[in-house]
Regions:
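Active-site mouth loops of central-metabolism enzymes
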Residues: 11-27, 72-84, 141-157, 234-248
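Active-site beta-loop-alpha junctions enriched in small/polar residues
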Residues: 16-19, 46-50, 75-81, 106-107, ...
């Protein structure tokens, strides 16, 4: 199967992040219980920088897979990892019946020297995908960038890298968040011409505060369309109206994708189940 669990006409999946502290697991489980009521195709779990919170990722992924009986996709970054580190995390995931990994390069740790960065065992995400494909039986996903990765020289270069990920063993992709669907539609067309044949889930992040948009754009490099900029300008001083308008924008964005034939949507929930519920009540399933 391409994506973990195809069961609805429109398959919606969620991203969550693990708790930062050991004492926060019960709250995290409650969030997951709420998200599970929406019958997602899968739930992905983010990974600490350099694997610093990989144990928490494994525990959350285990709860999703074993307690909730929903396919868990564990994020795995490799920029600061050795091959033995990767295999150890794979072993821990397998012991918890987790069979899906989203393979990412990850951000360079602040304490990583130039020498360490230059000599790292995994230079790019496709190296991790290839290693996992050759040494494990996980279903492997990769990331893609409708507006290109900020480090890429051009979209052509970025698409070449995406093809390398597919050739290395990625069976589906999850896109970086975007706010303008035209970028995604054009990206799909270009990816198809490049020979990308595996599914590409559309990554969608609801914007519910003016502060959030600045952080999100700086981290993702995503463009802000006029319609969203107008919402921020109109409601930045009114948090509740900003939240409502941001969720409405997200719903309209997803509905447009669905009406244009996009069946796989991945929602970056930011661990906010109430927000996710409002979105799920207003999109196609």
């Amino acid at each position: 199967m391409a994506t973990p669990n195809k069961k609805n006409k429109y398959d919606i999946s969620f991203e969550v992040f693990p708790p930062k502290k050991d004492g926060e697991f019960e709250a995290a489980f409650e969030i997951l219980n709420a998200l599970a009521t929406h019958d997602p195709a899968f739930i992905s779990v983010t990974y600490g920088a350099g694997g610093s919170r990989s144990g928490k990722t494994v525990e959350i992924a285990s709860y999703i897979q074993n307690k909730l009986q929903i396919d868990a996709v564990a994020h795995m970054t490799c920029v600061g990892s050795k091959k033995d580190d990767i295999l150890a995390v794979c072993k821990a995931l397998k012991e918890q019946n987790v069979c899906h990994i989203l393979a990412l390069r990850g951000d360079r740790p602040k304490d990583m020297s130039d020498e360490q960065f230059a000599s790292r065992e995994f230079a790019h995400a496709n190296d991790l995908i290839d290693f996992l494909h050759q040494n494990t039986d996980f279903t492997i996903a990769g990331a893609c960038y409708p507006e290109k990765h900020f480090e890429s020289f051009s979209m052509e270069s970025d698409l070449n890298n995406l093809k390398k990920k597919q050739d290395a063993g990625a069976s589906f992709f999850i896109s970086q968040l975007f706010f303008d669907n035209d970028f995604y539609y054009h990206f799909l067309e270009k990816a198809g011409k490049k020979g990308i044949t595996v599914p590409i889930c559309a990554g969608i992040m609801p914007i519910t505060s003016a502060k959030q948009i600045g952080t999100t754009v700086s981290l993702s490099g995503s463009s802000v369309p006029k319609a969203l900029a107008d919402i921020i300008a109109a409601y930045s001083d009114n948090p509740e109206d900003m939240r409502k308008a941001g969720i409405d924008f997200c719903i309209r964005q997803i509905r447009d994708l669905q009406e244009n034939g996009i069946k796989d949507i991945h929602i970056y929930t930011m661990n906010k189940p109430k927000m996710a519920a409002e979105i799920m009540a207003n999109i196609l399933r």
